[in-house]
């Protein structure tokens, strides 16, 4: 580890609903796939992890049938058999996350729409342990690449034109800010399709993060800075 580098961790989750609903709420979701990578401001990769959560993927097999990407379950099994992904307990995934953070002295964790990833992990922790309300340690910064992109990418005239030209607009006619569309803009690859698997999605999210830093502009970044700022599901 190079102590001169400010290492960062980029994380992504894939989830299944506890109760079937048309609304996508992190408080109704359980994490079955968590992937992360260690990177820096330039987007260089130093370590990757890909875990399938046993208690949800196996223990909640019926709920897995309602996952938005349930059709990927056979591919997950192929990846587990090949060693591409590891099937582990939730506590094991968290322990290894903390070990990686200590190894690289990480104090910032990024996700695209961190509100969702943070709270579905909190929900999963509560669901499995019946007592723990949180997943991340309290002494780190949770950062949101979606907020960063909204401040430094979406206002760009070139991005607005890109979205208009390719019909990447929401119902109000505003440019969309999905990780897939942002990456298409950054990379110039209009055929790019997001994998919607944990580790693979972090590969594009770290590019969004690096692109935002490269702009050297003021931007929102921190979602929750400490435990006093955490939002928990109301009882």
Predicted segments with their positions:
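Substrate-recognition/cap helix-loop segment adjacent to the acidic, metal-dependent catalytic center
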Residues: 115-143
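Short, polar/flexible loop-turn hinges at active-site or ligand-entry regions and domain interfaces
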Residues: 80-84, 131-136, 189-195
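Short alpha-helix plus adjacent loop in nuclease-associated cores
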Residues: 143-170
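Conserved protein kinase catalytic core
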Residues: 18-20, 150, 207
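Conserved non-catalytic scaffold segment of RNase H-like nuclease domains
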Residues: 2-122
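A short, structured active-site edge motif that brings together acidic residues
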Residues: 51-54, 135-153
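Acidic, Mg2+-coordinating catalytic module of metal-dependent nucleases/exonucleases
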Residues: 105-115, 119-120, 162-235
């Amino acid at each position: 580890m190079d102590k001169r580098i400010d290492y960062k961790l980029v994380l992504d989750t894939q989830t299944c609903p506890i109760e079937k609903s048309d609304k996508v709420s992190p408080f109704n979701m359980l994490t079955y796939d968590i992937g992360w990578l260690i990177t820096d401001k330039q987007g260089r990769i130093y370590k990757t992890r890909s875990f399938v959560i046993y208690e949800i993927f196996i223990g909640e097999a019926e709920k897995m049938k309602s996952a938005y990407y349930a059709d990927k379950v056979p591919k997950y099994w192929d990846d587990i058999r090949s060693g591409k992904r590891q099937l582990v307990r939730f506590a094991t995934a968290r322990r290894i996350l903390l070990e990686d953070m200590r190894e690289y002295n990480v104090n910032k964790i990024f996700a695209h729409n961190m509100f969702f990833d943070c709270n579905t992990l909190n929900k999963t922790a509560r669901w499995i342990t019946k007592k723990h309300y949180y997943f991340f340690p309290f002494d780190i910064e949770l950062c949101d690449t979606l907020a960063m992109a909204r401040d430094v990418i979406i206002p760009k005239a070139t991005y607005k034109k890109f979205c208009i030209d390719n019909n990447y607009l929401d119902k109000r006619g505003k440019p969309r800010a999905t990780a897939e569309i942002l990456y298409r803009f950054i990379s110039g690859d209009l055929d790019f399709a997001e994998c919607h698997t944990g580790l693979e999605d972090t590969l594009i999210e770290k590019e969004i993060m690096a692109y935002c830093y490269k702009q050297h502009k003021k931007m929102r970044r921190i979602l929750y800075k400490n435990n006093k700022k955490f939002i928990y599901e109301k009882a």
